[in-house]
Amino acid sequence: MTQFQITLFKGHPIINDGENVILIDTGAPSTIHNSSNLTFCSDHYNCSINYMGLTVSKISEMLGTEITTLLGADVLSNFKILFDYKNGLVEFDKQEINFNGTEIDISNFMGIPIIELSIDNQNLKFFLDTGAKLSYLSDSITSNYESIGTVEDFYPGVGKFETECFEITTLFGGKNFLVKYGNLPPLLQMTLMLGGTDGIIGFDFFNNFKVLLDLKNNSLKYGH
């Protein structure tokens, strides 16, 4: 078991491991590192330095802080991971993690976890993305709500963009919680449709629930 303090930089979970500054990104299929070899939790991994034109220096620039590593689903799926934002901790283990929560089955697309949430009595599928400070929904749903203003966000491969924001009550595990949603640029909206999902849920989910993620076995445990 390895435990790290999380720094939430603008809602993005970042950990320090020796010389490495790591962004934990369940929304990325592949890990990107500043060299082709990464040692993490005593294991060695071969990594991309450049994934479809993306490097950690480009991601650092968009993020607004320096990272050495974007830790994606290919490496994350080797671990059971407990996210505890309230206490600023994340735990990685190859074995079972003792956590008394409610367990549900989840699915995935290219290793990215997909969960079901409910909005306005509609069951919707969301990519569960620790790398997303803002969550996203299609404008066919957000058009029923008042905008609370615009924010700037970025998405690897697309760069920075502005979006209107909407605060929408969302239901998961019998708990209603407020989520700040934006709308994705059309190209990214198409990616969601390819994955058979309606949106992306990020920071607000992890800020409201303690979450144990087991990507390899498509399982999620949660507690309040």
Regions found by a protein language model. Give the residues of each.
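Pepsin/retropepsin-fold aspartyl endopeptidases
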Residues: 1-224
